[in-house]
Amino acid sequence: MPYRSMPKFDTGLVELGDGIYAYLQWDGGWGVSNAGFVDSDDDGLLVIDALMAPSMTQEFVRAMRTVSSLPFSKLINTHSHADHTNGNQFIEGAEIIAHQNCRNEMLDAEILAREAAVKSPPRGDKPAWIRDDWWEELAVVQPSLPAVTYGKSMSIQQGEHELTLEYRGEAHTTGDSLVLFADQNLFFSGDLCFFMPLLFAEEISRTG
């Protein structure tokens, strides 16, 4: 496969395991991230990450509703970046879970000030990486912070699946979570892995 090329795929759901789904977004560029969820008759839907623009998360919700009408029970934020947390408010009723550093980053005064400059009039110049069709949408985003945090690891029983949140240290941010499903031999990595580059240590690069 040529350098930096990737196979074409459609935006939508892919079933990875028993009741475990990934939601993929073409083309995976800046701010166009993936997410996932677990469908459990006993415990509702556990969602892994929200998305950047409200319309993106709302489309993700519509896709989940083609599988299940169960209420949302939990939402895991794998890290603090906007393309994984902006849509938190649209996963209605879910208890938000993340690493403690993720929550701290979301509360960081500098980050909140930067977000406010983007979202509040007068809004100034649009950052180059934000798509034109997102620009007005982002003004309605309200911060929705994790209510439950952990330090090293955390186990969650979701129906028949036991999943583990693990913190392996500073990487893409200071608070990245791996979401491991040992019984299915799969995991969700957030932005710990990219198609290209393999690793993008954004917050760590800023802080040295």
Describe the residue ranges of each PLM region.
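Short acidic, Pro/Gly- and aromatic-enriched capping/linker segments at domain boundaries
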Residues: 2-14
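Conserved beta-strand hairpin/beta-sheet module of binuclear metal-dependent hydrolase folds
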Residues: 13-63, 177-191
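Short Pro/Gly-enriched beta-strand edge/turn motifs at strand-loop
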Residues: 16-22, 133-139, 159-165
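Acidic/histidine-rich helix-loop elements
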Residues: 23-31, 108-118, 197-206
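Short Gly/Pro-enriched turn/cap motifs at secondary-structure boundaries
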Residues: 26-28, 138-140, 145-147, 167-170
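Active-site environment of divalent metal-dependent phosphoester hydrolases
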Residues: 30-32, 54-55, 80-86, 103-107, ...
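Metallo-beta-lactamase
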Residues: 44-46, 50-54, 155, 162-208
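Active-site HxH/HxHxD metal-binding segment of metal-dependent hydrolases
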Residues: 56-57, 62-148, 155
